């Protein structure tokens, strides 16, 4: 009964309070309505993420301003206000506690981050074939390299950008060549130590990252599990997936190159299916090799190497000349021709005061700016076929004026006159006129010959060049092409042998490539010392018999008064005649009816 009375009293007092307020009017009722509206405003501010807790507390304190007035009212009124305010503020406290930290704002900012793969078309082409990446012990860079564009970062927040590479599966693969496919070969090898490549520009603001393309072109792959250079360690013949990580600064405490990437709300990871690759130590698919050479700017050496090699093979096939494995004459070997031409008192522009010809005085005749036209040998010259007949038959008139003037400067050379060529051309019978003329490729200034007796008869073929060909000292090391006829007589009276009146072989001697006639200046070799019997046998003649069996022999000629020897390589018989002055050193038989060898003097 007492409880009922208390509740009734309470009800009656509360009802009385409300009835009194209703009867009195509207003053306190208006204040209560205003307080409820303010409490609703506080709840709306608590729902806003930008609303700080301090402002809401001020507003709540501001909303408690009606309480002094309510305290002046009866106890029932204060009880009602306490009940209502406790409900309102409990709701506000819950909302404020949920929005107290920056986590919801950060979460929303991380969700907005997007990463776009650059060079996606190139990655797609490699992926369609089956991307392969070379790994080495020292480390090898990736191609294509991972390049990404990042958007959606907070411009004022600090971020790390990192990359790691994880296995796609737990399988090991092998390449099947006949089907050009990768097949599973077994289970994967044991896991390797984790490695994370942190971009060198980290730590940077979001604005900095968004203004640039983030490139991982310096990242290297290695198969050395003991690597200490920070390279990514991978197993060969496994498939891997690169991943890009965006890590906010406040979540980067556990970030390390030798630890896995931390996981949390401040880390977002991106991967692209087209970047999956298989690690190899050597490319398995030739299509991948060609595509990388074509698209990789660092593979320029491979492209140029192949092209140069092809060009060199084409040149060698076109000219098909043997080149001696020694250094050719350079322009520096002939230095003072122009100076001595104006100031010398000798019989020729290149003759010193003692009358000795100076081969080093023809420097100005070797100017590379003045070059005769390119040509090939005539079909019957040196028994070498002319591949392009329209380039043959070049005479003196075909040379540019600068070449002809240089040739004219050599007219005072006394050495290889027209009589000397007749000695090489024919011995006993009248020689037929050679059909073609061979001139050096650069300039005729380096035409030199072998000393011959001045009493030999003349030859009309070389009259156009006879006065222009000079003789250098016999210490000059010279190469001369010789064409011998297998059907010719072995008793030819000159040192080259063969029936040259039929082959028309000796027209001129060139010392410049690519035409196989060279000049050198070397000291006398001690190996070629003259024996007494050779000295006595070679005092009177320069003649060596040349049989027709096509074998090559090295021959010595030791003229009187000379401290040098001459070697010539020409056809030699199996049994040397006792009368010739050449020692035959066989170099082997040469097929065919012609030989292309050289005479050189040291």
Swiss-Prot record:
Gene Ontology annotations of biological process type: cell fate specification; embryonic cranial skeleton morphogenesis; positive regulation of DNA-templated transcription; regulation of transcription by RNA polymerase II
Ranges of Low complexity composition bias in the record: 346-369
Disease tied to this protein: Cousin syndrome: Defined as pelviscapular dysplasia with epiphyseal abnormalities, congenital dwarfism and facial dysmorphy (frontal bossing, hypertelorism, narrow palpebral fissures, deep set globes, strabismus, low-set posteriory rotated and unusually formed external ears, dysplasia of conchae, small chin, short neck with redundant skin folds, and a low hairline). Intelligence may vary from normal to moderately impaired.
GO molecular function: DNA-binding transcription factor activity, RNA polymerase II-specific; DNA-binding transcription repressor activity, RNA polymerase II-specific; protein homodimerization activity; RNA polymerase II cis-regulatory region sequence-specific DNA binding; sequence-specific double-stranded DNA binding
Chain's role: Probable transcriptional regulator involved in the development of the skeleton of the limb, vertebral column and head. Acts by controlling the number of mesenchymal precursor cells and chondrocytes.
Keyword list, A-Z: DNA-binding, Nucleus, Phosphoprotein, Transcription, Transcription regulation
List of residues that carry Phosphothreonine: 330
One Pfam family this sequence matches: T-box
Stretches with biased composition (Polar residues): 71-84, 425-446
Presence of the UniProt keyword S-adenosyl-L-methionine in the record: no
The name this protein goes by in its record: T-box transcription factor TBX15
Gene this protein is translated from: TBX15
Record text on subunit structure and interactions: Can form a heterodimer with TBX18.
Family matches, as InterPro entries: p53-like_TF_DNA-bd_sf, T-box_DNA-bd, T-box_sf, TF_T-box, TF_T-box_CS
One cellular component term from this protein's GO annotations in UniProt: RNA polymerase II transcription repressor complex
DNA-binding region: 122-304
Stretches for region Disordered: 46-84, 338-369, 425-447
Subcellular location per the Swiss-Prot or TrEMBL entry: Nucleus
Organism (species): Homo sapiens (Human)
